Amino acid sequence: MAFNLQSFLQKSGRSLRVWNRTLSKASELESVGAIVEKNGPKALAKECDVLFSMLFDDAALKQICEEVTAAPPKKDLIWVDCSTVYPATTKEVAAKVQSHGVRFAACPMFGRPDAAKAKLLVGAFAGEETLKLGVRPYIEAMTRAIIDVGTEPHHGTTQKLCGNFFIASCIEMISEAVTLADKSGLSRQNVLDFINTMLPCPVIQGYGTRICEDNLAISPSNPGFAVKGGLKDVGLMRRLADETSTKLHIADIVYEHLEKQLEKGHGDLDWGSVVLSVREESGLPGEVEK
């Protein structure tokens, strides 16, 4: 995300200021002209016109919210949060920062790090219309598509959880189909041929290939979304389902399968490792080389 945004800003003579809890990660952007802000979110909130954030969980977002409001923030600061968090957390943060004069929107992103690098992310954008109009060019610089989810920021994170439910369900479906094929004499290439012919979309083709190839380890050259992150996100959608009295049976199954992988020490594998749980339940080996 940040590399594409910096490239966009450079074209108009502007620069990106960046911060990361792990400063070495932020420093990678210095080579393309970004400025590393070592003094953290408070300094960014005081000096920047637009602030983007991408944080792991609700606790991290709330902590940054405390720092932004204590800065104090620059007058009319716009903050666009791209994190996957619980909608009530987005609503809470929005109310707090807005009480300090900050204009807040949510635009959580669909896509892994490799998609971000290739500018293939999809954003679920929600906030006041004039704000969205003003910052849309920045978001377009980081995405291939934007889904407009209205004026309430928490609807952006609701959209993200609904979207992630689709993705998690696809992973479970592929895992079960591949296991059934394995046990019934079909080759995994047969499964991939069906996917590529009948269901040619990036999510199903990508995870179908990854699962069929037992390509579950994550590395800098082979990015993915880890089991630990999957548990967090599926946990959020299950919480929202409980709160709204909605049955998400597939989410319950996926959560159980991810928990099994975490218990086996596979927390850093891609969440496509759901297939290992399905295989084990079906009487097949549930291990793969990391």
Annotate each language-model stretch with its function.
Residues 84-168:
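Rossmann-fold dinucleotide-binding core
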Residues 55-67:
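Glycine/threonine-rich flexible loop motifs
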Residues 16, 36-37, 103-105, 146, ...:
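Hydrophobic beta-strand scaffold residues
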Residues 12-13, 33, 101, 185, ...:
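Glycine-centered short loops/turns at secondary-structure junctions
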Residues 155-281:
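Helical "substrate-binding/catalytic lid" subdomain
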